């Protein structure tokens, strides 16, 4: 919703990162839930006369219904049989497809098929839709969309730049999105939409953000992992004014009271689908180890705020320490990955630095030349990555939203503070339907580093009820 004062040039209410003010338009933009408090505030200011006399103009922009489309060639099983392990998805899709609902949040744990349910909902709603997510997740989504919806060229657009978005707008104005082969899905990153909105607020443009979906014929938005880049997704939902929103997120866990309030605004309780009980899938092991170099330990413990990338830079300066650290990871892989390994079984290893990922991948490749080892970071191909035996990545790249079939071991070398990130990484392991094995997540804890121990204790509490077992192992290994 947009609220404008007719008195030009006055910012009657200060903005912060969850609000937007524009001197160019003398406007104030906000979430619907703030309407009554803000209107009351403006009336008080007006009545007090401190800004002189002014009128308050209220505009209620109704969302655009969107272009009707059909997905005739899709490859989705729209109704799961009662004996299927995915039978519960029918209720999810029915809930999200209800024409009376304008906002649905799939608050469902990883591995329950949110992507498939979202695509089934898209098919059921029969509207041209937009997908918004992190740019690093778009490769995976492009594959899911083309594979499951069987879209031809001209039916699916992946927007990679501002100039491409401008080109798409021009095509829409010329009617080229509505031809014989009309657009059905448009995928774009949260950052790109953010840039478009900011550009308009700063200097204007041919199409206002709240008119964009009307111009493109978009009838709804699917937000994947909408808790990530949260402020961006909060803004775009506010500015784009979609007729329908489907949020996909397993972890709506606020870090503080302010974030909790914003989460309730962006993910209202009445919109959340949270009927499914959490099913523990994995075993978790905390692996304690020690550091020999007391000077390095002291330097790390003196950090005002713990930074794991700095930890890796300090630790990996020594050749012996690097070798010992890699052998520690290898010792974790021996019982839970290499023992009884079959084709198709996979392992995922997390580091803090991209360079650490590359270096460990080379080390592992030299030690096990028959093993397919790949890194997955910026520039690495998603389809090629998931075919590897061992994948080495950062938590920012592979910690969320990617599915790795056959993943049985996740090794986390990074002490993570954020609750949602820990749960997302835990969720990388999925129920094994092939070999009957329990997925394992193993994380490292340096007993000499205070923050490592602190984050471990937080995980012990956080993972209660979310894992089959959580065991602490004291290793004698030193690095």
Protein language model features and the residues they cover:
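Conserved pre-motif I regulatory segment
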Residues: 64-105
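Conserved Walker A/P-loop ATP-binding site and its immediately adjacent core
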Residues: 110, 115-116, 122-149, 352-357
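Conserved helix-turn-beta segment of the N-terminal RecA-like "Helicase ATP-binding" lobe
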Residues: 137-171, 367-371
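Conserved two-lobed SF2 helicase motor
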Residues: 178-201, 386-400
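Post-DEXD/H (motif II) to motif III coupling segment of the RecA-like Helicase ATP-binding lobe
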Residues: 217-220, 225-286
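Conserved interdomain linker/interface between the two RecA-like ATPase lobes of SF2 helicase motors
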Residues: 273-347
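Conserved RecA-like P-loop NTPase helicase motor core
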Residues: 378-462
């Amino acid at each position: 919703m947009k609220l404008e004062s007719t008195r030009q040039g006055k910012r009657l209410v200060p903005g912060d990162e969850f609000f937007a003010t524009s001197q160019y338009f003398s406007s104030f933009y906000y979430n619907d839930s703030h309407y009554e408090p803000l209107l009351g505030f403006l009336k008080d200011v007006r009545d007090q006369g401190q800004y002189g006399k002014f009128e308050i103009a209220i505009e209620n922009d109704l969302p655009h219904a969107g272009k009707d489309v059909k997905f005739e060639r899709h490859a989705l099983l729209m109704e799961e049989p009662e004996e299927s392990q995915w039978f519960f998805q029918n209720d999810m899709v029915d809930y999200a497809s209800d024409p009376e609902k304008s906002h649905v949040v799939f608050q469902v744990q990883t591995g329950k098929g949110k992507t498939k349910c979202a695509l089934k909902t898209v098919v059921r709603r029969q509207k041209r839709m937009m997908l918004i997510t992190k740019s690093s997740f778009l490769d995976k989504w492009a594959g899911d969309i083309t594979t499951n919806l069987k879209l031809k060229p001209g039916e699916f657009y992946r927007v990679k730049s501002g100039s491409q978005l401008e080109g798409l707008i021009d095509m829409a104005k010329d009617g080229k999105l509505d031809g014989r082969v009309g657009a059905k899905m448009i995928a774009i990153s949260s950052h790109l939409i953010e840039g478009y909105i900011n550009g308009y607020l700063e200097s204007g443009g041919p199409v206002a953000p709240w008119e964009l979906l009307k111009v493109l014929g978009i009838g709804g938005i699917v937000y994947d992992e909408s808790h990530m880049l949260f402020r961006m997704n909060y803004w775009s939902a506010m500015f784009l004014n979609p007729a329908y929103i489907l949020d996909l997120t397993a972890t709506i866990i606020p870090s503080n009271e302010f974030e909790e309030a914003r989460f309730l605004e962006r993910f209202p309780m009445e919109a959340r689908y949270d009927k499914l009980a959490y099913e523990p899938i994995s075993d978790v092991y905390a692996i304690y180890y020690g550091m020999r170099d007391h000077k390095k330990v002291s330097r790390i413990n003196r950090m005002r705020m713990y930074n794991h990338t700095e930890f890796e830079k300090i630790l990996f300066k020594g050749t012996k320490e690097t070798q010992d650290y890699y052998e520690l990871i290898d010792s974790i892989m021996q019982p839970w990955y290499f023992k009884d390994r079959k084709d198709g079984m996979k392992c995922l290893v997390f580091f803090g630095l991209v360079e650490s990922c590359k270096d460990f991948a080379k080390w592992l490749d030299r030690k096990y030349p028959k093993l397919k080892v790949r890194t997955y970071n910026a520039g690495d191909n998603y389809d090629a990555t998931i075919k590897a035996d061992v994948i080495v990545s950062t938590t920012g790249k592979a910690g969320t939203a990617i599915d790795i079939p056959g993943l049985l071991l996740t090794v986390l070398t990074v002490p993570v503070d954020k609750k949602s990130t820990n749960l997302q990484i835990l969720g990388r392991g999925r129920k094994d339907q092939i070999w009957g094995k329990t997925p394992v997540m193993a994380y490292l804890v340096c007993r000499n580093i205070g923050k490592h121990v602190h984050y471990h204790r937080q995980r012990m509490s956080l993972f209660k009820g979310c894992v089959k077992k959580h065991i602490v192992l004291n290793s004698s290994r030193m690095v």
